[in-house]
Amino acid sequence: MAARLLLLGILLLLLPLPVPAPCHTAARSECKRSHKFVPGAWLAGEGVDVTSLRRSGSFPVDTQRFLRPDGTCTLCENALQEGTLQRLPLALTNWRAQGSGCQRHVTRAKVSSTEAVARDAARSIRNDWKVGLDVTPKPTSNVHVSVAGSHSQAANFAAQKTHQDQYSFSTDTVECRFYSFHVVHTPPLHPDFKRALGDLPHHFNASTQPAYLRLISNYGTHFIRAVELGGRISALTALRTCELALEGLTDNEVEDCLTVEAQVNIGIHGSISAEAKACEEKKKKHKMTASFHQTYRERHSEVVGGHHTSINDLLFGIQAGPEQYSAWVNSLPGSPGLVDYTLEPLHVLLDSQDPRREALRRALSQYLTDRARWRDCSRPCPPGRQKSPRDPCQCVCHGSAVTTQDCCPRQRGLAQLEVTFIQAWGLWGDWFTATDAYVKLFFGGQELRTSTVWDNNNPIWSVRLDFGDVLLATGGPLRLQVWDQDSGRDDDLLGTCDQAPKSGSHEVRCNLNHGHLKFRYHARCLPHLGGGTCLDYVPQMLLGEPPGNRSGAVW
């Protein structure tokens, strides 16, 4: 028995000591002292529009009151600020100062569509924000619908880009977490919000809709229930897929090197030396005179939390570097931002017996449905493309010698070349009969031939002779030779016409040795190419409704 007690005592000594709760109830005298609120206390209980992810700046929940009726309050010891005692508002509970802080690591996410950017922007929402609402925008199996984050700055940036050209998107992110807490089950409402609710009609219909929309405009659609506070740096880079293909690069290669450069700017060197060296080799190979983030600089950057007013991009900005990053990290415990959070719709703050609760629920549901954005995936792909088996909203190509699976040309100068009409007149090939004429056509190592027009000095060939995909600038002249057919081995060449082809439709006239020639040809640059010889990069703009439409914009 004694041995058992001794063993139990040893085991108890080996157990970790209980961590003291950081918060305690303080007496009236201690509460009257000049204590600050816990950092970021005002962030919980604030209104948010879930479609734009914009904080409204208005507060449905009152986070200013901290004294109980008996004069006591809750004070919390902030280990991240030298154990300073700080006030916890009555509306908040379960406050914790987390020790995880910042990891010096850049995470990357690759997306290929605007709705994927919207989903990525809304990933900070850690719960199902739709609970209790009826959000049913344009229900159909061939439509991709986005609501949360659909009007966020990142989604608007991506939508604008995808209407300008073919893009892929890459997000580099650094996150830090320092504090967590949440709003109590039945929080005190802010006096202004109470007054706004009091002004609402008891029912929601077409005539009362403006009053409810006014409330949503001021307060948002949801309030923040629980938070994780700290900081986040995110850089969303837009990459022109086909321009990269013409430069002999893939979006994955560029994204890898962007992440490497971001890691260097936050002070990571040793563990990525091999990757950094590989990126330097790529720069030399492709004759790049600037860094990857300077070369590919179509970017939307956001910094959440901390002091950063002079630097808006801490990963790729001109002034970005380890010192600036460390200064930002050091400012986060005193000035944290919203990293992750849960949301609840505003109507749950009203009493279940209040008729305005159901009216507000219906107003929120209607507003969110109207704000949804979608992409119609039932539209057919352009000629030469097909639906992706992985994503019915994406059109892809069969990879070939001249195009990638992303439907991008593999090199500059590519065009489709065809001769569409040939006419000759005044030919003289035989002494005693009219000419038996045919035409040979040459370009880029190819030879095509017309049929023979018998016994005619003024023949016409209304045919299409297609050279297919050619290199317009380097394929040599487009050469037409007019021949008089005899026995086949001693045919007579009546003349040659050479023309350096240019993009577009053209008519050419030539004088032959024995007659005259006229022909028409058409050279069409492959998509994303332009200029006289198709050497220029040309963005491919999307047809259809541009982004930014308030109600149901199509992506």
Swiss-Prot record:
Annotated site, Important for oligomerization, chain positions: R214, E344
Domain C2 as annotated: residue spans: 397-519
Coiled-coil spans in chain: none
Signal peptide: 1-21
Span of domain EGF-like: 376-408
Disulfide bonds: C23-C76, C31-C73, C102-C176, C242-C408, C377-C393, C381-C395, C397-C407, C497-C510, C525-C534
Pfam family, one: C2
Residues binding Ca(2+) 1: G429, D430, D484, D486, D492
Family: Belongs to the complement C6/C7/C8/C9 family.
PANTHER family recorded: PERFORIN-1
Protein name stated in the entry: Perforin-1
Species this chain originates from: Homo sapiens
Protein encoded by which gene: PRF1
